[in-house]
Amino acid sequence: MAFANRSRIEQTVEALAQFNATPGAGITRLSYTTEYRAAQAYLKQELEAAGLSVRLDSMGNLIGRKEGTDRSLAAIAVGSHLDSVRNGGKYDGAMGIICG
């Protein structure tokens, strides 16, 4: 059974929080902005390093895929968002991505 690595989760939350248009005033990472695209590039690199195949769909969604070992079993899908509201919290969206 796999267990969550708390330190790695915290490091990734902090790394994503750096892609922010409003330092010192919460996290602002609006869709398709410079901050959003930089966070997306960072996340793409992390997913590839974890062994996932990664692609962007026609709407700009980043999709990571890891094949299972038993094709007779149903697929598992998880999702979240990388953008934020203005001056949001650093966990908004990030935790869903990281823990997914």
Segment roles from a protein language model:
Residues I9, G68-T69, L82:
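Short glycine-enriched loops at secondary-structure junctions
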Residues T12, G60, A74-I76:
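A generic secondary-structure signal marking the coil-to-beta-strand transition
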